[in-house]
């Protein structure tokens, strides 16, 4: 890897990058902090080269691997990790050792669900989120065409929303 990569250490750095290279993303401080914290929690850091291209570095090892890693992939993997952590917290709170254990995992679960809402909004702005909405709309349009009933236009909205809710609630696709 020949490119010199500058790793982000603060949410403001990610926001500054987005303001220049991905203005539609428009992350808040909290959004950027969530992305950076999840990456750090999984032993990765993200950064950019002098052209603004984003990279991911494995920070678990000295001189860890650096690879091109677009922001859409960052958001997607963070959504997946969030989903896995929600499942883990849900399992622990469903079978706690004691009341303190329950409270700990309930608090963790609520925090992860709050992260999920922010991540879902970010995911919708990615190429993956846009593609999912297009697929859902196309599917709904086909259903309406096959049934031939104009009254069923409401079905299109329902199906599109259902697919969207399913996909954002079921990370790890």
Each model region followed by its residue ranges:
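Hydrophobic, Leu/Ile/Phe/Ala-enriched alpha-helical segments that form helix-helix packing faces
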Residues: 18-22, 35-43, 163, 167
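Short, aromatic- and cysteine-enriched interfacial helices/patches
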Residues: 23-25, 122, 146-147, 167
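Short, extreme N-terminal segment that most often corresponds to the first beta-strand
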Residues: 1-21
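Non-Sec secretion/translocation targeting segments of pathogen effectors
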Residues: 168-173
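Composition-driven recognition of long, low-complexity, acid-poor segments enriched in small hydrophobic
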Residues: 129-147, 151-166
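Acidic, low-complexity, intrinsically disordered interaction modules
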Residues: 25-133, 139
């Amino acid at each position: 890897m020949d490119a010199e990569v500058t790793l982000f250490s603060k949410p403001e750095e990610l926001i500054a990058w987005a303001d220049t290279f991905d203005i539609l993303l428009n992350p808040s401080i909290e959004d950027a902090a969530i992305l950076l914290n999840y990456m750090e929690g999984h032993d990765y850091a993200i950064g950019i080269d002098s052209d603004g291209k984003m990279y991911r570095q494995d920070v678990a090892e000295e001189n860890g691997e650096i690879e091109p890693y677009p922001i859409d992939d960052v958001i997607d993997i963070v959504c997946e990790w969030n989903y896995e952590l929600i499942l883990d917290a849900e399992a622990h709170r469903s079978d706690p050792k004691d009341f303190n254990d329950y409270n700990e995992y309930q608090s963790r679960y609520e925090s992860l669900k709050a992260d999920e809402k922010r991540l879902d909004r970010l995911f919708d702005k990615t190429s993956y989120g846009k593609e999912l909405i297009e697929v859902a709309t196309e599917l709904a349009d086909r259903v309406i065409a096959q049934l031939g009933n104009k009254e069923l236009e409401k079905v299109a909205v329902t199906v599109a929303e259902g697919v969207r809710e399913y996909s954002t609630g079921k990370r790890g696709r």
